[in-house]
Amino acid sequence: TSRYNKVWEFPYEVRGRRVTMVFTSVTGHLSNFEFADDRHRRWNGVDPRELLVNAAVAKRVPEDKRQVADNVKREARGCDSVILWLDCDREGENIAFEVLAACREANRGIAAFRARFSALSR
């Protein structure tokens, strides 16, 4: 478990159904895009044109986010659905899809719902 992303469980009602709500958080993105080949990661050791034309890119969970991603996967295994409560902007949407991918890696059949909210300000 990530010490920064606690897990809470409590009884709740969703769409008229009593459920056990499992609530946790993430700290930013769960994954990064990196060059797949180690030799492409050294900026001064490769021709930039090769990076644009020939370099494969892979999406990976960085070491500092592994505990957070593992926490999401562990909790998703026992859930029927996930409600994604992330910011309703581009980054929030991107992070929501990363969280959903982690959930579905652990539980292919998990249903997904998206909470939509906005802030009122003066």
Task: Indicate residue ranges for each PLM-predicted region.
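Intrinsically disordered, low-complexity regulatory segments
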Residues: T1-R122
